[in-house]
Amino acid sequence: MQGKVLMIDHEKCTGCRQCEMVCSVFHNGASNPSRSRIKVVKWEHMGFYLPMTCQNCEKPFCVEVCPTKACHRDSEHQRVLIDRDKCIGCKTCIIACPFGAPLFDTVERVTIKCDYCDGEPQCVRFCEAKAVTYVDADKINVGRKRDTSLKFSDLMRQLIGGY
């Protein structure tokens, strides 16, 4: 992978949802978190918050299932993008994504997802807790990602009752 990616540190997230607000303002001109391309999943009783956005998967299911090819990989930056002009709002990409990253914009009736705010992610810029950072893809510490994934997996087991 090349370029830059969003790195989420759930341990730093306070659940303030500032990222959702600034994303919606950047893209829509008004604060409307339901139209944000990043969502903070909250488990209030555990004090656990997880900002979720597109992972730009190596083999993105959303791209594979899109009937109009609106969902595609940008060859220059290797990001998964959605061409709003081609999107027919069928939601197959939403169903296919294991992370729930593509979202349906009920106002414009098309699927939306993180586009890194044209190279200057507003969620990163305004996250006071520094839970969301924008880093070179090659510099992601694989060991740290693995450790974080294992911690998250353990937490999910606790949340669903010890499976």
Predicted segments, located by residue:
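Flanking helices and flexible, charged tails adjoining ferredoxin-like Fe-S electron-transfer domains
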Residues: 3, 35-36, 41-68, 84-163
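N-terminal cysteine/histidine-rich coordination modules
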Residues: 1-13, 18-43
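Membrane-helix exit/interface motif
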Residues: 70-72
